[in-house]
């Protein structure tokens, strides 16, 4: 509002989104009054930091109870795992990583499902254009699926996290969907729950 005949106090605001690219920004303000007298100030700058961050859901990956020893190429019943880019830095291909652990039997702890029996992909097994073949290798040496290694971070092939508005929920704008396959259940293990309780959670991160 007007302070006097020659001075006015003007307030404004500018929205900054979490996906705006980091760097130096200039603040430019100009004002023209009713008599076309004009003034401006372009001397102020600010720096928006670059932030690498993700949010992952769901927190639990589950399989149907009818999975038995010898079963092959089983897909999760609550996929995909959604990885949201909540920062403003693009994650390039293969730099979304997963660290898996062997799944230990909750009753008989000497029995386990090896982490290497799982594979992951950014396409699911219902993809009809194959190759690529989705998260299950199905006996095919697919270069697109990524096999897990116990306790070691593995970059997921073709996984890209663009910078964008992930709330669009379209699987591409600031978002990646990944699908996990249990390629085979070892013969000779008993029917029981196998989980991460003993060796720790699986971790999805970015490099």
List each model region and its residues:
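Long, low-complexity serine/threonine/glycine- and acidic-rich segments characteristic of extracellular
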Residues: 1-42
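Signature of Gram-negative chaperone-usher
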Residues: 17-19, 41-207
